[in-house]
A protein has these predicted regions:
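Ligand-binding pockets and gating/stacking loops
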Residues: 1-440
């Protein structure tokens, strides 16, 4: 068995040398990796087929998005003093989110998220894994766990990997953890708002499909010598991987990244920017069965000139997020797709007016907001509350473990079930976590 594992590793390495695949596990079946997740006891709960995670890297302000506090005064709300009503009575959000205000019946706001950490990496790890660091294990993020239970090990047949990040990954503390590289996300790179979306290892910038085909013909001619050797099983395996890789690049798999067939009107609704078009790409990936997609949006770490940044960021968020919800609903996909909006923490409720911050907000993990929609989550609700200045949780504290366990349960993954790990430890998927029962 050890010899077989080594052979599989070598064949994968050779494929990588040839530039055929851009991410771990991209084209290989179960033979190249370890334990089959089907052997794990999974208790069927919900029926959500996909999760779209809208990740606001840097930490978005809760006061300037989904938990406005105009009554707290200028030192807290700054220039955003006029929150707007939504299409749900009693729910108001920031005035720079008018399109989302019209979609409030589709999402619920959690205003009492808390974990207490003000460090980016720690906050990201807590929010992505539902665990606090401290032991010798680096736990897998939510995307990797969903990939374990709903990816290749559970019958996923898609050419596109089951865990996609648009466009840059967050890093090792929010990815595959101890599950290993098979469950690492495939980060596309590139920018889907560009004329040609250059996807890392799939759609090369400046390389036409015809040139890719010519390269394949050349590779076939070079392979002929090795394949002519009798009984050379490794070349046969490599050839199979090559076929899968090129089917991804030139076949139906690669077509999902070509948005030229999307109507201009719809693309405009999402916003002709990286975030908006990434949201549209996420919908396309859901349509072909990809179970977990992360859309990373940077620029939320607003220590300085916070409000100037928000005037640029919030309209992009408003268009992309609202268009995604409406588009999923119009296509009958929202009922089976969970959308979660969050960052690693919130930002200080009290504005830092003094120099050098000049109206900035710092990191704040004591109290912040998250948003969930679809896949079994009810819309038009508020979970928990912050105090009158947004500084502390005033009721119904919600941990990242509670949020993640609820997403797992609605995805058909038992949070109390066993979680495979390399040390053979008795670990559970998300133990001792509460559920957001009021909106499930």
């Amino acid at each position: 068995m050890a010899e077989q594992r080594n052979i599989n590793f070598l064949s994968r390495r050779e494929a990588l040398k040839l530039g055929l695949i851009g991410a771990a596990g991209l084209t290989f079946g179960k033979y190249a990796f370890g334990e089959d997740a089907n052997s794990l006891a999974t208790k069927k709960r919900g029926n959500a087929k996909a999760v779209i995670e809208l990740w606001m890297s840097g930490g978005p302000s809760h006061l300037d998005t989904f938990d406005p506090k105009p009554q707290a005064g200028n030192d807290y709300c700054g220039p955003f003093k006029n929150p707007i009503s939504t299409n749900i009575d009693g729910i108001q959000i920031c005035e720079l989110l008018p399109l989302l205000a019209k979609q409030a019946d589709k999402f619920s706001i959690i205003r009492s998220m808390t974990h207490g950490s003000n460090a980016h990496e720690t906050g990201t790890y807590i929010m992505k894994t539902g665990r606090k660091p401290g032991d010798n294990l680096v736990y897998p993020g939510m995307g990797a766990v969903v990939s374990l239970f709903k990816g290749y090990d559970s019958g996923y047949k898609g050419l596109i990997p089951p865990y996609i990040v648009l466009t840059a990954a967050e890093g090792r503390f929010s990815e595959e953890g101890f599950l290993g590289p098979r469950y690492k996300p495939f980060a596309t790179g590139g920018d889907p708002s560009q004329k040609r979306f250059a996807v890392s290892g799939i759609v090369a910038e400046g390389i036409s499909d015809q040139r890719q085909k010519s390269r394949r013909e050349l590779l076939h001619s070079l392979d002929s010598l090795g394949k002519a050797m009798p009984g050379n099983k490794e070349f046969e395996k490599l050839d199979a991987c090559e076929d899968k890789a090129y089917n991804l690049i030139l076949g139906d798999g690669g077509k999902v990244f070509d948005m030229s067939n999307e109507k201009d009107e719809l693309r405009d609704k999402y916003g002709r920017n990286k975030f908006g078009q990434s949201c549209l790409m996420a919908r396309r990936l859901v349509e072909i069965g990809v179970p977990y997609i992360t859309v990373n949006s940077g620029g939320w770490d607003t220590h300085k000139q916070h409000f100037e940044m928000m005037r640029r960021k919030l309209p992009e968020l408003d268009k992309g997020f609202s268009a995604l919800l409406a588009d999923l609903a119009d296509r009958g996909l929202l009922e089976s797709t969970i959308v979660v909006w969050a960052g690693e923490f919130g930002r200080t409720p009290k504005v830092l007016w003094e120099s050098p911050w000049n109206g900035g907000r710092g990191h704040y993990g004591n109290c912040f907001s998250a948003v969930v929609a679809g896949g079994g989550f009810k819309g038009g609700r508020i979970v928990g509350a912050s105090d009158d200045k947004g500084e502390e949780v005033a009721g119904r504290p919600v941990s990242s473990a509670d949020l993640i366990a609820s997403i797992y349960e609605l995805s058909g993954i038992d949070p109390d079930g066993p979680l495979s790990n390399p040390k053979g430890l008795n670990l559970q998927v998300m133990p001792s976590a509460n559920r957001l029962k009021e909106i499930m």
